[in-house]
Regions:
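Acidic, glycine-rich flexible loop segments
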Residues: 94-110
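Cleavable N-terminal export/targeting peptides
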Residues: 1-21, 146-149
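Outer-membrane beta-barrel architecture
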Residues: 43-47, 77-81, 106-108, 131-135
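Glycine- and small hydrophobic-rich membrane-insertion segments that are intrinsically disordered
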Residues: 84-87, 111-114, 137-142
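Transmembrane beta-strand segments that form the barrel wall of outer-membrane beta-barrel proteins
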Residues: 22-34, 42-69, 76-78, 86-97, ...
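Outer-membrane beta-barrel "beta-signal"
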Residues: 42, 127-149
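Short, surface-exposed coil-to-beta transition loops
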Residues: 73-77, 99-104, 127
Length: 149
């Protein structure tokens, strides 16, 4: 366990160099799918951003609820994503309450609030999803000197 802690600290030290930072970004999304179902998502992205290094990337973990007739159906999801400019892409999976997994592709454009589209392969109730999400990125967690302004 000690080796992993030391490796983690070394990685954080390297990532914090030269105007870079790990970050966390909670978000809330509201949208609809092509079948007319409303959905609500909450998510948190854990990522890395740099002025001079690789493009911003992150791991997103979230929950989504689809309004179905008189009930809400819950799904969980995770994505790996890269947001090089004011837009980006991601790939991941959604899971239903029974543990079934669905491949998921996502894209979006904007900053702090952005428009989104995601496609879930084989998910009959919601293959095409459109929405808007508001996020609150918190930079320089665990140190770092990234300044987005």
């Amino acid at each position: 366990m000690r080796k992993y802690k030391l490796l983690f600290l070394l990685i954080i030290g390297v990532l914090n160099a030269s105007g870079s930072s790990p970050y966390i970004s909670p978000g809330i999304q509201l949208g609809f799918n092509t079948k007319g179902n409303l959905f609500l998502s909450v998510q948190t992205t854990f990522g890395y951003v740099s002025n001079s290094g690789p493009q911003p990337f992150g791991l997103t973990l979230g929950l989504r609820w689809y309004k179905m007739e008189e009930k809400w159906e819950r799904y969980s999801y995770n994505d790996l994503q890269i947001w090089p400019f004011i837009g980006g892409v991601g790939i991941g999976q959604m899971r239903d309450k029974d543990g079934n997994k669905y491949l998921r592709f996502k894209t979006g454009v904007g900053a702090l609030f952005y428009a989104t589209y995601d496609y879930c392969k084989d998910l009959e109730i919601a293959k095409h999803n459109f929405g808007g999400i508001g996020t609150l990125p918190i930079y320089n967690i665990l140190g770092g000197d990234y300044n987005p302004l």
